[in-house]
């Protein structure tokens, strides 16, 4: 399997859009339609979260989505069925967001074999410390799946250097302390870390956690970020809108964000 994440960053200009939704929200059929709609309306790469009962990195919106999906019977196997139904229907590379215990319980080798079958391009394991990730990284590299590394605002220079120089796919820079979602002004420290990373590696820098406004997007373009992850706003639409209109609303949000990334970069 050829990994297309690198090609996306090389071929697309400006700030790339990486929307996130939880698999199975609000139900499997509408979830599939929502993912296809994100692809058609401007997503460059799509992140998909596998529901988990203890998502320590996620805020209340995504926690709620995971809990509801689990109550509806969505587990790893059902998540894979949704992914199988997406094969050939979207052009954006898919990255799966999964917690480490889920991965261990399912079996790492079996999980990676399934990702290859489903043509998934990358994996994010938010609760796996970088220093403990080498075995998984080696297995991912062999299978041409990018294990995406995360960098926190609190990371030391030596840690940033180590992670940046061994990164695959892109570097996921967490824009704030705490969990996903929420609002607020971006810290100036983020600008410094983006600059630091880009001096250490040619790998793209993608910023996520709490990105939800045009002002933030404008700042990140000025700070030379290569991409943004938009998660909670997308999930919130699937949770709070009626089933008849949630895909339409999500399509509108993706279009609006895509226009912001384009218009502010001109």
Curated annotation (Swiss-Prot):
A GO MF label: tryptophan synthase activity
Alphabetized UniProt keyword annotations: Amino-acid biosynthesis, Aromatic amino acid biosynthesis, Chloroplast, Lyase, Plastid, Tryptophan biosynthesis
Major location category of this protein: plastid
The enzyme's E.C. designation: 4.2.1.20
Enzyme class, broadest EC rank: lyase
Active-site residues from the entry: 47 (proton acceptor), 58 (proton acceptor)
InterPro entries with a match to the protein in the record: Aldolase_TIM, RibuloseP-bd_barrel, Trp_synthase_alpha_AS, Trp_synthase_suA
Subcellular location field: Plastid, Chloroplast
Coiled-coil ranges from the UniProt annotation: none
Pathway note: Amino-acid biosynthesis; L-tryptophan biosynthesis; L-tryptophan from chorismate: step 5/5
CDD domains noted in UniProt: Tryptophan_synthase_alpha
A single GO cellular-component term on record: cytosol
Catalytic activity line of the entry: (1S,2R)-1-C-(indol-3-yl)glycerol 3-phosphate + L-serine = D-glyceraldehyde 3-phosphate + L-tryptophan + H2O
Homology family: Belongs to the TrpA family.
Role, per record: The alpha subunit is responsible for the aldol cleavage of indoleglycerol phosphate to indole and glyceraldehyde 3-phosphate.
Assembly and oligomerization: Tetramer of two alpha and two beta chains.
Protein known as: Tryptophan synthase alpha chain
């Amino acid at each position: 399997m050829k990994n297309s994440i690198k090609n996306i960053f090389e071929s697309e200009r400006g700030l790339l859009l990486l929307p996130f939704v939880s698999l199975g929200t609000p139900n499997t059929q509408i979830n599939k339609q929502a993912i296809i709609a994100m692809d058609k309306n401007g997503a460059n790469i799509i992140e998909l979260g596998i529901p988990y009962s203890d998502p320590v990195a996620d805020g209340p919106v995504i926690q709620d989505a995971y809990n509801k999906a689990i109550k509806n019977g969505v587990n790893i196997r059902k998540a894979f069925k949704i992914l199988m139904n997406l094969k050939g229907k979207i052009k954006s590379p898919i990255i799966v967001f999964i917690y480490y215990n889920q991965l261990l319980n399912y079996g790492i080798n079996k999980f990676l074999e399934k990702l290859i079958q489903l043509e998934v391009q990358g994996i994010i394991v938010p609760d796996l410390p970088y220093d403990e990730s080498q075995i998984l990284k080696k297995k991912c590299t062999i299978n041409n799946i990018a294990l995406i590394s995360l960098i926190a605002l609190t990371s030391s220079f030596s840690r940033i250097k180590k992670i940046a120089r061994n990164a695959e796919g892109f570097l996921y820079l967490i824009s704030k302390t705490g969990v996903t979602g929420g609002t607020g002004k971006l810290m100036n420290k983020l600008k410094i870390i983006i600059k630091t990373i880009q001096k250490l590696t040619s790998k793209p820098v993608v910023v996520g956690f709490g990105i939800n406004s045009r002002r933030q997007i404008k700042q990140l373009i000025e700070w030379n970020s290569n991409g943004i992850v938009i998660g909670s706003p997308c999930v919130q639409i699937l949770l709070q809108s009626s089933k008849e209109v949630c895909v339409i609303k999500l399509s509108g949000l993706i279009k609006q964000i895509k226009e912001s990334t384009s218009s502010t970069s001109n």
